[in-house]
Every structure is written in structure tokens, then in C-alpha cells.
């Protein structure tokens, strides 16, 4: 029997025997708590400086996105206002004043 094949079946048997333990081992192997630093001590998580930098970057990104949305709405509103004024002027040019309006304007003079 091939020893490598026997080893593979043993590993597969361990994973299939108790899947919750295998899942826990897999989760523990890939967390930040399992990372070992050069000093040999396990690092508990990100340090305070990197958390501060991440928070500042998040705030900067949110400010840029907020300004983009605000200016987008502003310029969209201005564009619609300009178009509506143009449409009103277009309708006013096509409209002819009635003769009654002229009679009222000319009457008092």
C-alpha cells in the first residue's frame, strides 16, 4: 500500500470524523490572532496607529463621496432650472399678445 495514500485517507478521516473541530481548526489557522511576529509573540490585532489611519482614511473617503453627491445634485438642479427657463422663454416667444391687452395698454395713454 502506498504510504502517501494512507496519509491522505487519515487526514480525510479526521476532517470527516468531527467536522466542527475541523472547522474550528481552519478558522483558527486564518485569524489575525494566529499571526506570529518577529519577536515570537502572537499579535492580538491591529495596533492603535493603524486603526487611527484606517479611521482617517474612512472619514476622508466619506467626505469626498458626500461632496460628490452634493455637487451632483446642485449641478443637476441648476441644469434643470436652466432648461426650464429656456422652455418658458420658448413658450413666451411663440405666444402672441391678444388685441384686448393692446387696447387696455393703449387706452389710458
UniProtKB/Swiss-Prot annotation:
The chain crosses the membrane at residues 56-76. Its main location: cytoplasm. InterPro entries: Reprimo_fam. It is found in: Cytoplasm; Membrane. It is a single-pass membrane protein. The modification Phosphoserine is found at residue 98. GO terms for biological process: regulation of mitotic cell cycle. Keywords: Cytoplasm, Glycoprotein, Membrane, Phosphoprotein, Transmembrane, Transmembrane helix. GO terms for cellular component: cytoplasm; membrane. Glycans are attached at residues 7, 18. May be involved in the regulation of p53-dependent G2 arrest of the cell cycle. Seems to induce cell cycle arrest by inhibiting CDK1 activity and nuclear translocation of the CDC2 cyclin B1 complex. Belongs to the reprimo family. This is Protein reprimo. The lineage of its organism: Eukaryota, Metazoa, Chordata, Craniata, Vertebrata. The gene is RPRM.
